[in-house]
Swiss-Prot record:
SUPFAM superfamilies: Trimeric LpxA-like enzymes (SSF51161). The lineage of its organism: Bacteria, Bacillati, Bacillota, Bacilli, Bacillales. Gene3D superfamilies: Hexapeptide repeat proteins (2.160.10.10), serine acetyltransferase, domain 1 (1.10.3130.10). It comes from Bacillus subtilis (strain 168). Keywords: Acyltransferase, Amino-acid biosynthesis, Cysteine biosynthesis, Cytoplasm, Repeat, Transferase. Pfam families: Hexapep. Its EC number is 2.3.1.30. Pathway: Amino-acid biosynthesis; L-cysteine biosynthesis; L-cysteine from L-serine: step 1/2. The keyword Chaperone does not apply. Belongs to the transferase hexapeptide repeat family. Inhibited by cysteine. One of its GO terms (cellular component) is cytosol. It catalyses: L-serine + acetyl-CoA = O-acetyl-L-serine + CoA. This is Serine acetyltransferase.
Length: 217
C-alpha cells in the first residue's frame, strides 16, 4: 500500500506538470515530491507517537526542500505541490485527495488555541501561489483559491475565491453578483430628518390638544 502510494505520487506529477519528462528526473529533482514522501514517513511515525523522530524528519525535509509540513498534518492521495518553496502546512490541517497547492501557500492557524486550528481542504481543491488559508475553516470540494488571497471563512464546494479578505466570485460555475444598487441603500441622514419631522407633527398635535382644553375652561 505504501509503495503504491509513492508510485501514485510520481504519476500525479506527470498528470499535473507538463514539464515533467522522465521518472528519473521527477524522482531526483522535484522538491514537492520529496517533501510529500518525507511527510508520509514522518506522519506514520507521528501516529505511532514517535514525535521527536517525526519532527526531526520534518525539519530535515524543510531544510532540503523549503517546504514545511508538520508531521501531524493529514494528507490524502495524489497531493501535488508545484514549485513548493515557502509552503507551510500546520499540524491539524486535513487535506483530501487530488489537492494541488503552489509555492508560498500557507495553511495555518490564527492564534494559540488548542485542538483543531488549521484548515480542512476537501478533495480536488486548488490553492494558487501565495494564498493564505487560516484557521479551522473548510475549503470545499473542487474549490479554487486565487493567488495571493487571504481566506478566513469557509469556502463552499465548487467555488472560486479571490482577494483580501477572500470572497467568493464564482460558485457552481456561475458568477456571484455583488449588490451595487446604491440607490437602494439606507440613507441615515434622510431617515433622521423623517424622524424629526414625525416628532414635530406629534408636538403640534399635542399643542393643539392643550389649546382646546384651555379654551374649554
Amino acid at each position: 500500500m505504501f509503495f503504491r502510494m509513492l508510485k501514485e505520487d510520481i504519476d500525479t506529477v506527470f498528470d499535473q506538470d507538463p514539464a515533467a519528462r522522465s521518472y528519473f528526473e521527477v524522482i531526483l529533482t522535484y522538491s514537492g515530491l520529496h517533501a510529500i514522501w518525507a511527510h508520509r514517513i514522518a506522519h506514520a511515525l507521528y501516529k505511532r507517537k514517535f514525535y521527536f523522530l517525526a519532527r526531526l524528519i520534518s525539519q530535515v525535509s524543510r531544510f532540503f526542500t523549503g517546504i514545511e509540513i508538520h508531521p501531524g498534518a493529514t494528507i490524502g492521495r495524489r497531493f501535488f505541490i508545484d514549485h513548493g518553496m515557502g509552503v507551510v502546512i500546520g499540524e491539524t490541517c486535513e487535506i483530501g485527495n487530488n489537492v494541488t497547492v503552489f509555492q508560498g501557500v500557507t495553511l495555518g492557524g490564527t492564534g494559540k488555541e488548542k485542538g483543531k486550528r488549521h484548515p480542512t481542504i476537501k478533495d480536488d481543491a486548488l490553492i494558487a501561489t501565495g494564498a493564505k488559508v487560516l484557521g479551522s475553516i473548510t475549503v470545499g470540494e473542487g474549490s479554487k483559491i486565487g493567488a495571493g488571497s487571504v481566506v478566513l471563512h469557509d469556502v463552499p464546494d465548487f467555488s472560486t475565491v479571490v482577494g483580501i479578505p477572500g470572497r467568493v466570485v464564482v460558485q457552481n460555475g456561475k458568477k456571484v453578483r455583488r449588490d451595487l444598487n446604491h440607490q437602494d441603500l439606507p440613507d441615515p441622514v434622510a431617515d433622521r430628518f423623517k424622524s424629526l419631522e414625525q416628532q414635530i407633527l406629534e408636538l403640534k398635535a399635542e399643542l393643539e390638544d392643550r389649546k382646546e382644553r384651555i379654551n374649554q375652561k
